[in-house]
Amino acid sequence: MSSALAPVGIFDSGVGGLTVARAIIDQLPDEHIIYVGDTGHGPYGPLSIPEVRAHALAIGDDLVGRGVKALVIACNTASAACLRDARERYEVPVVEVILPAVRRAVATTRNGRIGVIGTQATINSHAYQDAFAAARDTEITAVACPRFVDFVERGVTSGRQVLGLAEGYLEPLQRAQVDTLVLGCTHYPLLSGLIQLAMGDNVTLVSSAEETAKEVLRVLTERDLLHPHPDDPRAAGPSRVFEATGDPEAFTRLAARFLGPAVSGVRPVHHVRID
């Protein structure tokens, strides 16, 4: 049985999942977390579903083996590729990023026209389209924005080049007259100002990061796994461990855009292996 004192494990293909980590830290400030960025293999968007599944489950195995009390798949592509496998494989609760965002979008839309943007792999998986299928009177327009992740990973989140790219990607959503847009990749919140500019103020952006953090809070509360309040004698100050399967220094530089100086001393992970 998991302990409330155990950490929450979070992973992504790179730094994008730090938007989820940031939201979890904001909403659950007492929780210990371990974050793994799979920069040695990511981004996952261009990979095949079997490749993504293999990389994601290897990291999941590692985190669960280290005793995390919950596993957060902070990557839309990985959520689409391996959620069912992960929930069958692990005894700890597994939280993903797709359904929380879908619920918020359905509750937010006024005209029933909802847009989704994500990596090519996420859009091709139809994970969002399938998740919206149960919602009545909704019309979904899904668009792949494959180059967005590359810009974010390089730290380029503004300027004419990326704005022009965004306008081209988002034009089908404007034609569809969506009033709600799901940012279906955890990298995309760093482009939210630019995306809002391209879409206009009448379109509401839904961040999977914020909604996923709310789902983590719900799951931990439901299972009596919330970390004790700081006044509780069992409690200790929250520890935040960040690891990368690639270059830890490069990860640290990029991660500063998400969490500022909170990310330091990133540890390289050499023991995550793909069978």
Swiss-Prot record:
Note the superkingdom of the native organism. Bacteria
User: Where, by residue number, is the active site?
Assistant: 75 (proton donor/acceptor), 185 (proton donor/acceptor)
E.C. no? 5.1.1.3
| KW NADP (keyword) present | no
Positions binding substrate in this chain are 12-13, 44-45, 76-77, 186-187
Q: Which Gene3D superfamilies match?
A: 3.40.50.1860
Stored SUPFAM superfamilies? Aspartate/glutamate racemase (SSF53681)
Which InterPro entries does this UniProt record tie to the protein? Asp/Glu/hydantoin_racemase (IPR015942), Asp/Glu_race (IPR001920), Asp/Glu_racemase_AS_1 (IPR018187), Asp/Glu_racemase_AS_2 (IPR033134), Glu_race (IPR004391)
**What is the catalytic activity of this protein?**
L-glutamate = D-glutamate
Q: Name one Pfam family in it.
A: Asp_Glu_race
Q: What class of enzyme is it?
A: isomerase
GO molecular function term, any single one: glutamate racemase activity
Q: What does the UniProt record say this protein does?
A: Provides the (R)-glutamate required for cell wall biosynthesis.
In the record, the note on similarity to other proteins reads: Belongs to the aspartate/glutamate racemases family.
- Identify this protein by name: Glutamate racemase
